Amino acid sequence: MKTKSKLNVKFTFKPFSKKQLQVLFWWQSPQYKDKFAIIADGSVRAGKTVIMSFSYVRWAMMNFDGVNFGMAGKTIGSLRRNVIRDLKRMLISEHYHVKDNQSENMLTVSKNGKTNYFFLFGGTNEASQDLVQGITLGGFFFDEVALMPESFVAQATSRLSVEGSKAWFNCNPDSPYHWFKLQWIDQLAKKNAIRIHFLMKDNPSLSEETLKRYDSMYSGVFYLRYILGQWAMADGLVYDNFDREKMVVDIPKETVWEKQWISIDYGTQNATVFKLWSLSKGTWYNNAEYYYSGRETGRQKTDEQYIDDLEDFFFDHNLSRRDVKLIVDPSAASFKKALRNRGFVVVNANNNVLDGVRFMMTQMNLGKMKWTEASQYTLKEFGSYMWDKKAADRGEDAVVKEHDHCLDADRYFAMKVLYVKKQRNIKLRKEGI
């Protein structure tokens, strides 16, 4: 049984904003103490999560003893990473005793002669509701509730049968037709809930420089949601931040490439594309492109024929199989096997569409990804790759699976090369809220 109770990094509290103080004391306020739920939604990095989780445990410890409580994230891993690590530091700094039973995903928290138990859950999919069946709880904290299925949240809130129990919701905005927006935020009176809407300026730990940096990172629907904190619909062009004047460049002939990758979107009926990405002075350039559509030409190619074309692509651009790796859609099993049989180094792409679109838009805005006139099919797709309006009307974010082959390959590249590098540079934050 694996347990931990000590952390080496002490949490330093900074002065709270007005909204953070509301979250911290709402359950003691004569105006709100009888409310069943609190909802803290709004922009990213607004100081919602840390104050919500701390207030939740503080409320539980001041009002209950020997009671079970629930805490959930999209996954248990994300909950531990985004909430529990800092929460334990905060609690220990405030003289709570915390024992983390990692094998059972349970925190045992004690102070002033009281002990309560906080069970950790992942609200990943429809089957997740089975995880909370049968347990009686005094409260439930949902981190990023907009990423969870309605069935899980409904089952979890139905377990709150202890007298005085409350639900705590925290999230960034999604579609205005998202189930949580319709069922909770739009029905505060019916749900007997209080809502506190956050913006980044409500986080006192963020400097003006940091605020400006985040403001420049997002575009389109993600800017409306993550910066302005609006429940906005995904419609129109997916990459509406694409600026041809800034993002399509001529590359000097004497440019020396520091590193190169090829990203591949493979299709049998649909198009197959190879995208050459080359690094120079901190920016990646798509300086060559292969595009073939059997549907458009009326003649399909076999895996071996595509690999023949890839060998020609390597020869034409003076590429080495030893140095230039291929990023390929993980679903293209037979094609990947054939590539490896011919001596190519293949790595699986990350095919999370929404995360990939959001991250690639950020890299475009930061000037980390640029294209050339050689990317002719990609440039066409930037003007025709659309959000799915029918899905948006259902409260879902989805793209229309048309005019997306080159941009899918670009997304694979961004998530495999740029995102991994970004994750490696993350350091443990030692500042406060």
Question: Locations of the language-model features?
Answer:
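Pre-P-loop entry segment of helicase/translocase ATPase cores
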Residues: 1-37
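Conserved P-loop
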Residues: 35-105, 181
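Catalytic acidic motif of RecA-like/P-loop NTPases
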Residues: 77, 146-147
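Inter-Walker segment of RecA-like/P-loop motor cores
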Residues: 80-138
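ASCE P-loop NTPase helicase motor core
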Residues: 139, 147-217
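Short beta-strand scaffold segments in enzyme catalytic cores
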Residues: 271-277, 411
